[in-house]
Amino acid sequence: MRRLLSVLFAGALLGIPVNSNAQVASDYPNRSIRLIVGFGPGGATDTFARIFSGPLSKALGQTVFVENVAGASGYIGWRTVATSSPDGYTLMMAENALVIRPGFKDIKPQFDPSTEFTPVAFAATSPLAICVANTVPANNMKELIALSHSSTKKLTFASAGVTSVSQLIWDVVRDGADIDAIDVPYRGGGPAMADLIAGHVDLTLPSSQVAKPLLDTKRIKCLAVTGKTRSPALPDVPTLEEAGIKHADVDLRFWFAVFGPKGLPAVVTAKLQKAIQAALQEPQLKERLKSLDITPDYAAGPELHARVVSDVKNWGAFIEAKGLKGQ
């Protein structure tokens, strides 16, 4: 008893709430939660995060609000989460860009996504679509390839950033298809798509979820999708394989996953995982995701961590083999 009183007294003198972490974790969440997206509004990750935040809020019993923290191809948003308090009130919805950036050894500072975050849960996947402006005189990949080599005006490709998913997957596609185009990096997929619609750039590579409503309203053209099978959302658009395009053995889909700061308490992580799994099973969300060609694909922290480690290795090997630079 004397020892316990001494500990309590010492804690009070130092201003340390005794067992505060356990108390915070036990009633988590008791206020709203920030879900950081490292890119601007309108891109694939932002779109999924906003659709998903409603069912996740319902499952957690607290509001989950999306906050866009764009810059440096996602890095500013990721760093915001990495340096936040590990209490579960600042999370991030990340995508493949998180595992691509470490492969660019010329970019500083370097970071390791497998050790600097708490992997909470893998959530979903979505194929990408090769889209061109209506002003581009090409209606299939064969015509696009020919145009890229014959046009007096160089084609321009708009990416979500130098080290973004769209840029790297485009590098894989370009390598396999031998397409000649100038890269134009943007601060997110939303601005890139806006300029494609306006005809300021010729090509971009959004997720099929972003492409579908624009294709349906004939504001853009889609020439191919990156999945191994045709997209249910874009059934008339061929796959790269059907278009005769071979590519390196890397996964050419967007994936979406939830991470927290390093050191997130296990009880908080478990509550989040349970809520994420429940949210992904909500019938209305499943129908909404299906209409956008997003496939729920829940996996808990250990599996997500293994995926991060594997993807960092595979993308790093591709980047090194092709001599790609991030700056």
Predicted feature locations:
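N-terminal (or domain-start) structured segment
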Residues: A22-T115, K154, V162, D178-S207, ...
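Extracytoplasmic/secreted proteins, especially bacterial periplasmic and envelope-associated proteins
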Residues: T47, I51, P55, A59, ...
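HAMP domain helices
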Residues: V250-D251
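Short, low-complexity disordered leader/linker segments with a strong preference
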Residues: M1-N30, G326-Q327
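A ligand-binding cleft/hinge motif common to bilobed small-molecule-binding domains
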Residues: A97-D106, V172-G176, L203-V237, G316
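An extracytoplasmic/periplasmic, membrane-proximal ligand-sensing/linker region
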Residues: N30-S32, D175-I179, E242, A266-Q327
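Hinge/capping helix and adjacent helix->loop/strand transition within the periplasmic-binding protein
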Residues: T83-Y89, P102-P191, L240-I245, W255-R288
